[in-house]
Every structure is written in C-alpha cells, then in structure tokens.
C-alpha cells in the first residue's frame, strides 16, 4: 500500500484533524452554545439595565429639551415618609419659638392649611430655641426632613429661618434635591401664614411658583458605553477558556503525543485548531453584532456593520493566539478556568484605565501606547470607546467603512489612534502571540518532559531536517548539568554477549541484515542532573542512567518480548525508539532509518504503530472515528480508509460498537481499540506496551489471538508484566534490569539456563493396594526413591500429588530415573507423572533478584524481612538466602538461615512474598555482610535512622541443599513445556 507523502499528506492530516475538532465541538453542545450565544444574554442584560435607567429618569426633565419650563405652584409640605432615607416614626417638620403664643398660632395654621392634606399634631414637634433643635437632631438622626425657627421681635415683625440637609440623595437611579422637595414648601407655608397673622386676614392668599431654567437635553448615561467593554470581554472569555482547555486536555491526556508518534505534522495540528477556532470566532462576532442590532442599540445601528463586526472578530481572534501561547505553560486542564479568570480580571482593570483616557492621548509617549496595546483588551476597549463616542448623540452619524482611518466624531484623545489603527494592532499582536505559541510549544517540556533548545530555530538542521533530532530534558528555568558517560560493562551472559558482538560487527561493517527490523546499537539514555530555580528555593537532581548501552537485533515476522521490573528501562527503550525521548548515546536503525535523524524519524513514524500502556482515546469520538483519524494521519489513501477501518474493527470484534463513543466502552473494549489503532495502516513495526493490562481473562485471550494473527509480515515489540502472556506470544524474550540487557533468547532457552531446574509433578491414585485411601505410607517410598537417586525432597505435597524441583546438574540421570519410576508406577500408586522446565516467572525473578542484589551492594538499598519468630532483619533487595545473626547454638554452631521468596507487586517492583522455615547453615557455606561498615543502609522508604539488625547474605552457589517447607505457598505451573508419563 502506497502511503501519502508531502503536501497531500499534510492536507489529509489537516482535514482529519479539522473534522476531529468539529466533532468534539458538536458533541460538547453546551460549551459550544455558550461560546456562540453568550453575547445574547449579556446584550439582553445591557438592554434591561438601559431600560431600567430610562424608566427611572422618565419623570425627570434632565433628559429632555426644555424651552418653556412649567412652573411648580405652591407645593405642599410632603409627608416625612416620602424622604429617601428616614427612620420611622418620623416628623414632617420641627420648629422652635414655642414660648410665643403668636408663633404657636402660626405653626398651627401651617399644619391646618397645608395644601392637599392637613398635618396631624403628632407629626410635628416643638422646641424652645434653635439650640434645642440642634441637640435633638444630633441625638435623633434621619427623623425629620426640615425645621422652622421663629422669632417674634415685636408686634409687627416676626422673622423665621429654615433648616434642612442640603445634600442631595440618590436611590435606585433617582435623585432627591432637599431644596425643591422640602425647603421651598416650608418657606412658602411659613411666609403665607406669617402674612395672614400680621394683616389679620385668614383668607389672604397669593400664588407663588418656581420653575427651572430652559436647557437642552443633558447627555444620558448609556449602559452600553459604561458596562459594555466589561460584558463583551466576558463574552470573549468563554471561547478563550474553552480553547485553552481543549489544547491542554490533549496535552495532559497525551493525545497529542499519540498523534505525534503516529506521524502528525505540527503544521497540520496548529492549522486545524486555528481554522476551527477562527470559524467559531467569526460566528460569535457576527451573532454579537446581530444581537446588538436586534435590541436597537445606536452603537450597532449607526456605525457601519463591517466596522463593528471586524472589531469584535479581530479581538476574539487575537485571544485565540493568546490562548495558544498560554497553553504552552499550563499542564493541567483544570487550570484553564483560573487562567481565564485572571486574564479577565487584568483586562477589567486595564479597561478601566483605558476608558479614563490612558494612554491614548497625546500627553503619553508612543512607547507607553505601544506596550499598552500589546494586551488585546486594551485596544479593544479603545475601539469600543471610539465607536461609542461616534454615536453619543442623536445627531452623530457613527463611523463608516470608508472613514475608518479618519478621526471619529467627538474624539477627545487628539486622534492618536483610529479604528483602522486598532485593526492593525489586533492583527499584528495575533501573529505575535501565534509565533510565540509555536516557539514556546517547542522549548517548554511536553508530556514526556522533553523540549528543544531555546535557540533551536537558529540551527540549520531544524530547517533542512538533516542536522539530527536534538532535543533536551528539563524546564526552561533549569540548569542542566553535564551528562556523565556510561561505563561499558562486558555482559556476563553468553547469549547477551553473542548478541552484542553480532550487532557491533554489523555496525562496523555497515551491514544491515534484511531479516532484521530493528537494530539497536549501544542505545544509552541518561537523564542529566538539573538545578531548578524556584521561588526562594533551589532543587537539584542527580544524573540517572536509564539505559546503559543496549545492543540487540529484533527480527521481522517475530514478536520480541521485553521484560523487566519497574525501572528496568523497558518504557524508556520504547520512548527512544518512537522518538519521544532523545537518546544520550548510541543509535537504533528501524528498517534502515536512524532514530537520531529527523528525516529518519519522520520515515519511522510512517511505518510504526503504538499501543501505549494507558488508553489514549477521546471519550467523545467513536471507535470508527478514532481509526479514521489515525488512518488519515498515517497517510492511507482516502479511497481505502473506510474499508481498512471496517477490517480493523472486525479484527478486534468491535464492528457493532464501531459507532459508539469510546467513553461508553468498557476497559477491555478500549484496549482492543488501542490495539486496532496501533495496527491501522499495516505498520511494519508495532509497539505494544502492556496491551492487556486490566483485562478479564476472556478478553485477554482474544487480544492474544489478535496479536498472534497480526504477527506475520511485521515485527512486534511487546512489554508486559504477565509471564504467561510473554511465554505464549513471544518468539524471543529479552529481560532487562537496571538499564541493561541481562538475558536474551527463546522461552525454552531462558528456562533451561536460568530456571532452578526441572519440575516433576507426581499424582497418586485415590487408593493404594486396595486400602481405600492414600495414606502417608503410600507416599514415603516415592519420597525415598527421589532422595536416594536425585538427593531432592518434595517442595509441596498432599495426599493427591507431590512436586519436586530437580537441579540441572541431575539432567543426565533423568532418563534412567524416570524410566524406572514409570516401571514402578503401580508399586508406588502413581497415576500420572509430569516433567517440565521451571516457569518463566521463576526465570524472571532470578534475573531481577540478581540485578537488585548488585545494585544493593553499591547503594545499600535495604528492605525489612519479618520472620515468623516475630523478629525482623534488614536484607539487601534481591537476596535469596539470608543467615539470621544471633541464632548460634550448640546444636547449630553457625546459626540458622532462611530462603527469601520474591515476587512482583502490582506496579512491577520486587517485593518479599515469604520465606522458608529456618534451617541450619552448613559448614561449607561462606557468608558475607550485605553492607560494608559505615556504608549506611537506606531502606526502600528512604529512611535513615538507628541501625537495625542486618541479615547475612549467603551465596546461592553454595546452597545446594534441599528445602522442605515455607511460610508461603509456592506453586509451579503445570502448563508449558513438559513431558508427561502416564499409565
């Protein structure tokens, strides 16, 4: 099958990624709806606020042109309850001068003759003099709107004074002027009744009125002008937060990393996001303008449609570039909302400064204006201000498209920035953010902690693709130390040495075996020591050698299984081969392409498939859509994609679930889909990193069948913690530990070389010699037969069977031994004899234990062994036989020892599973201390403290005795390679 290349592949990837973005947005309907229609709700809110403001001023003449004001004739004294802010019960007015009977009569007349209503006596309070009134007012605030002070000077002269609080009050948009509302009614009432009293005519009256000056319409407060910039910024924040969240989610879940391993171009990735977000931005800006016109705002009606639309679209488009850039520094999608709120808060503050005239006035320097204009909300706010000023009065025509480069009407800034200038600023800063986004995306650590040099774009190799594939580890603000070289150690295993010699010979001669898919040449990976500078602290890390020179061939049409405990270097090897991690030393050729060349890596990614350890899937996409996406990324011809997807779904038995979203899949279905993704496009090399983790047995068996069927025509590299899986699927197995290859070969080869020996399982008939039951007497002859001929005892026994471990050095005796045993089956009551090799798990544990023990001898890593006696000792990780200090007795002058049993925990690390019963230490066995004096043991929890009792390490080469019991059950698999003898 011919795959797409060059520009056609770029266009195909772009189309597939664009469709992926469209589907994700379509299926996140709530988020997409808010992004597009948030402007409607904010504009509706502005409309309601504007309507409320207009209603509150409806009775006021301030917003009207008044040429002939209407006079207000003799207004009455209002009830005190009409005052905006008053404490109840209150008084309509208070007065002083109550020692005068004439003054008292005048006040009574004021109360009686108040137009429209008389004032009850309980609503008025009298005092002797103004000082008494002041004292009462200070003690009783907000109880009365005004006071009258009368002084009877003689029979014909009565003077008075009025006391009110002259501060205007405001409540819910309405103003209360005490002069007009309280002072003038009190003044008219006092003068009227004083005049009637002095002339003696109670019916005397005159008309007194007052009116405001003629005035034009006062410019009203427009809600859109005051709160519009903040609301429109909030509208844009919806798309901003969603964009950052989408980018970070793909990075956090390693979805982008998966696409990179499959060969996606960065250009296609960023262009697909830019195009889709640009479309959403254009729709959002269009709807914003249409909603503004629908609510009849002059801002949208008078200004030219393209002028307003372009301002909103360029602003939101600018925020896309800002979101791209900020996403490079954020690692958690949950932080997207926090970042969005912070940008909104900063934008709100800077918009307030911009609305006050800073810095878009001639008194500010161009440098300040340029720096201020880099932040998108600032130029957007200034653009809104210019458009609002152009429609501030009914006579203002707004800004047309042809006059966008001219100074707008009512521009009080000195015309330092026109609408056209704002367009150019928004467009220019978008390209600035976008270029910075691409730059920071390359120099900030990705999900694997890898980044490029900060000067990567200055290197010719980056542009030509021939200068290597140089990347670095660590953050931007970390100082990477020198990488210490890896000391070459000649392998002590003959198979590993033979493999290394063969690869070195091919490398020196420049030969490439046509039957070899992957040739690893001294691959080394060291994480350098770094110094990270943070706030008031400095963190240092030491160099760590993850791979210490790996040499091996992986043949075509074979499945190579890479085993090893946690930290062995399996995943690091895969990450180096797939280009996720840079190699420190050595190289690897995949079908003749070097992983250290960017051109070679580009070719490699076209021919590999990867099933990561954890499912890397979009919950919102179906299984069929996943396969179509990755098929397009791999460059399959468009005409063959549908048929290839149907075939892949059928292979993993997901045809019926192909159109169901992956988020609804079970764990097993997701793993099957991940395997299908790795096999899409018929890759020549497939990496399967623990493909059956967490599967139920039935699903696991089915996935094994899939892997077996797809082995032909390609090479497969498998990592797993399941020894059964490795035994069944692999053609060759390599076991790694501590960054080195410890053994390599077929399963049979490894079992025969590293197993404890042969496993003999003897099954007994239900009755012996017609006794009706199998007692212990019927098994004793068998035990004696094994002990006399092979010097072994059973490691496990019950009334139905016995299990013996026969050392390899007895292999030459087995033929005659089992021939005689088979001849005596009836005598011994034996129903079945099985002979097999040790299990692969035992081989793995032996290799892992040895590596851990070597490491413990260097760094003193210890773990606690709890004995059945209740005591505990510190032992090196991986030690098999341990002498117990302080157990010397007359019966056992050298003390006792135990065999420690090890197993893998759920994370793949070695842990203690139990130990044998205590046994005497034979005289011929040399013993050594696990840690040299003063070395300072460190346990697995990393604690240093008081020195505990340390066990004595016994070399297993000398421990050739037999074992008869343990504190934990140890069973041996009866499946696999075995010979079966039955009567």
UniProtKB/Swiss-Prot annotation:
Disordered: region residues: 963-983
GO CC, one annotated term: membrane
Pfam family, one: ABCA11_C
InterPro entries documented for this protein: AAA+_ATPase, ABC2_TM, ABC_transporter-like_ATP-bd, ABC_transporter-like_CS, ABCA, ABCA2/9/11_C, P-loop_NTPase
Keyword terms of this UniProt record: ATP-binding, Membrane, Nucleotide-binding, Transmembrane, Transmembrane helix, Transport
Primary residence: membrane
Gene3D superfamilies to which the protein is assigned, alphabetical: P-loop containing nucleotide triphosphate hydrolases
Domain ABC transporter: 518-763
Superkingdom field: Eukaryota
One GO MF term: ABC-type transporter activity
Record field: transmembrane: 33-53, 221-241, 279-299, 305-325, 339-359, 416-436
Ligand binding (ATP): 564-571
Location in or out of the cell: Membrane
Membrane protein topology class: Multi-pass membrane protein
SUPFAM superfamilies the UniProt entry points to: P-loop containing nucleoside triphosphate hydrolases
PANTHER family: ABC TRANSPORTER A FAMILY MEMBER 1-RELATED (PTHR19229:SF205), ATP-BINDING CASSETTE TRANSPORTER SUBFAMILY A ABCA (PTHR19229)
Family: Belongs to the ABC transporter superfamily. ABCA family. CPR flippase (TC 3.A.1.211) subfamily.
Protein name, entry field: ABC transporter A family member 2
């Amino acid at each position: 099958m011919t795959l797409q290349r060059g520009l056609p592949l770029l266009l195909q990837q772009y189309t597939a990624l664009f469709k992926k973005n469209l589907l994700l947005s379509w299926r996140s309907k709530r988020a997409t709806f808010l992004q597009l229609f948030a402007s409607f709700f904010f504009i509706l809110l502005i409309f309601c606020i504007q309507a409320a403001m207009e209603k509150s001023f409806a009775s006021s003449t301030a917003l009207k042109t008044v040429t002939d004001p209407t006079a207000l004739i003799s207004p009455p004294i209002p009830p005190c309850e009409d005052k905006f802010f008053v404490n109840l019960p209150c008084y309509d007015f208070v007065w002083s001068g109550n020692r005068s009977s004439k003054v008292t009569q005048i006040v009574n007349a004021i109360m009686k003759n108040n137009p429209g209503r008389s004032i009850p006596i309980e609503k008025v309070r009298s005092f002797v003099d103004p000082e008494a009134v002041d004292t009462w007012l200070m003690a009783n605030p907000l109880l009365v709107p005004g006071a009258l002070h009368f002084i009877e000077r003689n029979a014909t002269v009565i003077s008075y004074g009025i006391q009110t609080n002259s501060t205007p009050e405001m409540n819910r948009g309405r103003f209360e002027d005490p002069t007009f509302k309280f002072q003038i009614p009190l003044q008219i009432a006092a003068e009227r009744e004083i005049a009637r009293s002095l002339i003696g005519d109670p019916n005397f009256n005159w008309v007194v009125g007052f009116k405001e000056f003629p005035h034009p319409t006062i410019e009203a407060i427009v809600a859109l002008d005051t709160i519009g910039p903040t609301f429109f910024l909030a509208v844009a924040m919806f798309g901003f937060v969603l964009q950052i969240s989408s980018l970070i989610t793909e990075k956090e879940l390693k979805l982008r990393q998966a696409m990179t391993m499959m060969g996606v171009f960065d250009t296609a990735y960023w262009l697909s996001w830019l195009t889709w977000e640009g479309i959403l931005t254009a729709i959002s800006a269009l709807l914003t303008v249409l909603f503004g016109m629908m609510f009849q705002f002059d801002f949208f009606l008078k200004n030219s449609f393209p002028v307003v639309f372009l301002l909103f679209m360029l602003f939101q488009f600018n925020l896309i570039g800002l979101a791209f850039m900020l996403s490079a520094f954020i690692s958690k999608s949950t932080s997207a909302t926090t970042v969005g709120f912070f940008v909104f808060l900063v934008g709100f503050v800077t918009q307030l400064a911009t609305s006050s005239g800073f810095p878009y006035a001639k008194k500010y320097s161009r440098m300040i204006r340029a720096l201020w204009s880099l932040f998108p909300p600032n130029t957007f706010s200034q653009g809104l201000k210019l458009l609002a000023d152009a429609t501030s009065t009914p006579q203002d025509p707004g800004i047309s498209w042809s006059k966008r480069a001219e100074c707008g009407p009512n521009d009080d800034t000195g015309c330092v920035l026109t609408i056209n200038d704002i367009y150019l600023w928004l467009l220019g800063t978008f390209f600035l953010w976008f270029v910075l986004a691409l730059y920071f995306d390359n120099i900030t650590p990705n999900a694997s902690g890898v980044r490029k040099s900060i000067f990567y774009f200055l290197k010719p190799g980056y542009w030509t693709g021939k200068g290597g594939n140089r990347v670095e580890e660590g953050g931007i603000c970390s100082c990477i130390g020198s990488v210490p070289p890896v000391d070459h150690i000649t392998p002590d295993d003959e198979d590993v040495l033979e493999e290394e010699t063969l690869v070195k010979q091919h490398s020196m001669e420049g030969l490439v075996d046509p039957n070899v898919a992957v040739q690893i040449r001294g691959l080394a990976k060291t994480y350098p020591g770094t110094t990270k500078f943070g706030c008031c602290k400095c963190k240092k890390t030491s160099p760590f050698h993850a791979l210490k020179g790996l040499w091996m061939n992986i043949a075509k049409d074979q499945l190579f299984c890479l085993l090893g405990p946690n930290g062995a270097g399996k995943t690091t090897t895969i990450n180096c081969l797939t280009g996720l991690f840079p190699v420190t030393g050595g190289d690897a050729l995949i079908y003749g392409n070097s992983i250290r060349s960017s051109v070679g890596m580009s070719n490699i990614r076209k021919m590999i498939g990867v099933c990561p350890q954890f499912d890397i899937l979009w919950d919102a996409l179906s299984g069929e859509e996943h396969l179509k996406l990755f098929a397009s990324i791999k460059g399959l011809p468009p005409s063959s994609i549908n048929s290839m997807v149907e075939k892949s779904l059928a292979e993993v038995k997901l045809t019926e679930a192909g159109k169901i979203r992956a988020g609804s899949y079970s764990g097993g279905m997701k793993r099957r889909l991940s395997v299908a993704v790795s096999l899409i496009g018929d890759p020549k090399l497939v990496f399967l990193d623990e493909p059956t983790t967490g599967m139920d047995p039935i699903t696991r068996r089915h996935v094994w069948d899939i892997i077996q069927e797809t082995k032909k025509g390609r090479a497969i590299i498998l990592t797993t913690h399941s020894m059964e899986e490795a035994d069944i699927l692999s053609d060759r197995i390599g076991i790694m530990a501590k960054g080195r290859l410890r053994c390599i070969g077929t399963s049979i080869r490894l079992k025969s070389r590293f197993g404890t020996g042969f496993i003999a399982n003897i099954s007994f008939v239900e009755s012996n010699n017609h006794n009706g039951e199998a007692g212990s007497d019927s098994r004793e002859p068998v035990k004696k037969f094994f002990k006399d001929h092979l010097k072994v005892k059973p490691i496990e026994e019950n009334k139905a069977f016995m299990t013996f471990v026969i050392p390899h050095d007895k292999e030459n005796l087995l033929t005659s031994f089992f021939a005689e045993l088979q001849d005596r089956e009836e005598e011994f009551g034996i129903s079945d004899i099985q002979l097999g090799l040790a299990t692969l798990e035992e081989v793995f544990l032996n290799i892992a234990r040895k590596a851990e023990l070597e490491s413990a001898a260097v760094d003193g890593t210890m773990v606690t062994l709890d004995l059945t006696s209740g005591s505990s000792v510190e032992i090196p990780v991986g030690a098999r036989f341990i002498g117990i200090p302080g157990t010397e007795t007359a019966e056992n002058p050298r003390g006792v020892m135990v065999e420690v049993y090890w197993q893998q925990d759920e994370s793949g690390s070695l842990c203690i599973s139990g130990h044998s019963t205590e046994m005497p230490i034979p005289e011929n066995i040399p013993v050594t201390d696990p840690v040299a004096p003063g070395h300072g043991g460190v346990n697995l929890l990393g604690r240093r403290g008081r020195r505990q009792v340390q066990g004595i390490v016994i070399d297993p080469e000398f421990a050739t005795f037999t074992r008869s019991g343990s504190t934990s059950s140890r069973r041996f698999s009866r499946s696999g390679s075995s010979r079966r003898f039955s009567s």
